[in-house]
Design a protein with these regions (language model features):
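N-terminal leader/targeting segments and the immediately adjacent pre-domain N-terminus
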Residues: 18-111, 137-141, 385-391
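Structured C-terminal helix/loop/strand segments within mature extracytoplasmic catalytic/sensor domains
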Residues: 21-34, 343-391
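Active-site SXXK
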Residues: 100, 118-145, 230-234, 282-289
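Short, charged, amphipathic alpha-helices and their helix-cap/turn boundaries
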Residues: 101-106, 148-150, 186-216, 240-259
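Active-site helix/loop module of the DD-peptidase/beta-lactamase fold
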Residues: 137-180, 236-277
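Active-site-proximal alpha-helical segments within enzyme catalytic domains
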Residues: 226-233, 273-295, 349-365
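Active-site Gly/Thr loop motif
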Residues: 256-257, 307-362
Length: 391
């Protein structure tokens, strides 16, 4: 029997690694009929901070975030010393919130309190919440989530769609189970005529050039087509544009004004990646999500939608689960499991929420690879808030 060559084995290992990253939300953005994210390259020009900024009693900036005081200073400061020394990669910020209060705020390297940091795939999570906001305002209903995407997109020529395309629901798109499969050669050819991908033409191209869509339940595949369809539905149902709706009714309601959000090839906001948020504003997303859609006494998103979005709808063999563009997995300390709900982005961007402890960890980074902070947070930070003896 002929043995596989070393090159074949290396390619197999790379394929396995990429598949694993795609199944936990940490893979680099893979574009087909989307514009590539440019925020990472833009931030390369930021000089590293000469000295880390570390606050164990963060300032009240009158931005809607309650502040408190870190009690377990020694252990946290020992860990942040390791971050500053580069022992955990290129970390840019670490914020901790406990019981709804920001108790620790720190910035390193390219991290800035007033500069939006690229988010990569957390943009998907924000897109899901924009759909939730549309439901809260009556532009959609919870029942609409189970309706076909094409039923909202009136410009789609349904006579040209591949078999099964009409059956893809909004809920399936937000759970990465559209079933759309476009090979790279076809995608490259379609990208040569970008004018045809403007507006709903982007979705027409996906649904017209995909392999036939199988009947549900379909296989989970982490890809750009599904959030693109979701953003197109938002554009179709809200007054004005999706961009204005996100600015006014989502970000504006949380006092988020200093942000970035790139346009996709469709001229709609990007959805698979492409947003930039300040670390404090990432925390706002976490606080609002942990509070089931409520922000400063106002119900911005239906609690039912938030629960569904952060639910374990699909669980992969690695034990990581996916809802509507939000992740969840179990963190372990000793013999106890703690459910962690999260937004995740390539390069090391995280909003990690531990409901049982009312704990939120916000992390930004510019890792060359994906970094190990997801596991490090479980091993180094979480135990400090589980054990009452840690100091």
């Amino acid at each position: 029997m002929k043995r596989p060559s070393l090159i074949t084995l290396l390619l197999l290992l790379i394929s396995i690694r990429l598949t694993a990253q795609e199944s936990d939300g940490l893979a680099p953005e893979i574009t087909d009929l989307n514009s590539a994210d440019v925020s990472y390259n833009a931030e390369k020009n930021l000089p590293d901070l000469k000295h880390p900024f570390i606050a164990t009693e963060p300032n009240d900036r009158n931005d809607g975030i309650p502040v408190g005081k870190l009690e377990k200073k020694d252990a946290v400061l020992a860990f942040t010393k390791e971050i500053a020394e580069g022992k955990h990669g290129d970390i840019d910020s670490l914020l901790l919130s406990l019981d709804g209060e920001l108790i620790f705020e720190s910035y390193y390297r390219r991290g800035r309190a007033n500069y939006p940091h690229y988010q990569m795939s957390i943009t998907k999570s924000y897109t899901a919440m924009a759909i939730g906001r549309a439901i809260q305002l009556g532009h959609l209903t919870m029942e609409d989530l189970d309706k076909p995407v094409v039923s909202f997109l009136k410009e789609i020529d349904q006579t040209k769609l591949v078999e099964g395309a009409k059956s893809i629901t909004l809920a399936e798109a937000m759970n990465m189970k559209s079933g759309i499969r476009i090979d790279q050669s076809t995608a490259k050819e379609l990208m040569k005529s970008q004018g045809k991908l403007k507006g709903q033409g982007q979705i027409q191209a996906y649904l017209e050039n995909s392999a036939p869509i199988p009947a549900a339940p379909r296989e989970f595949k982490y890809q750009g087509s599904d959030p693109s369809m979701t953003m197109q539905v938002l554009e179709a149902v809200v007054p004005g544009s999706a961009a204005d709706f996100i600015k006014k009714e989502v970000l504006g309601k949380m006092g988020i004004t200093n942000y970035g959000w790139q346009d996709d090839i469709s001229d709609l906001p990007k959805s698979a990646a492409g947003s930039s948020m300040r670390s404090r504003d990432m925390l706002k997303w976490g606080l609002m999500t942990m509070n089931e859609g409520e922000w400063n006494g106002e119900q911005l998103i239906p609690a039912e939608f938030v629960r569904k979005a952060t639910e374990k709808i699909n669980t992969n063999p690695q034990g990581t689960s996916y809802g509507y563009f939000w992740w969840s997995h179990e963190m372990i300390v000793g013999d106890k499991n703690y459910l962690c709900k999260s937004g995740r982005g390539a390069g090391g961007q995280f909003i990690l929420m531990i409901p049982a402890l009312d704990l939120i960890m916000v992390i930004t980074a510019h890792q060359k690879g994906m970094g190990k902070m997801l596991k490090t947070a479980e091993e180094k930070i979480l135990p400090l808030f589980v054990s009452t003896n840690s100091q």
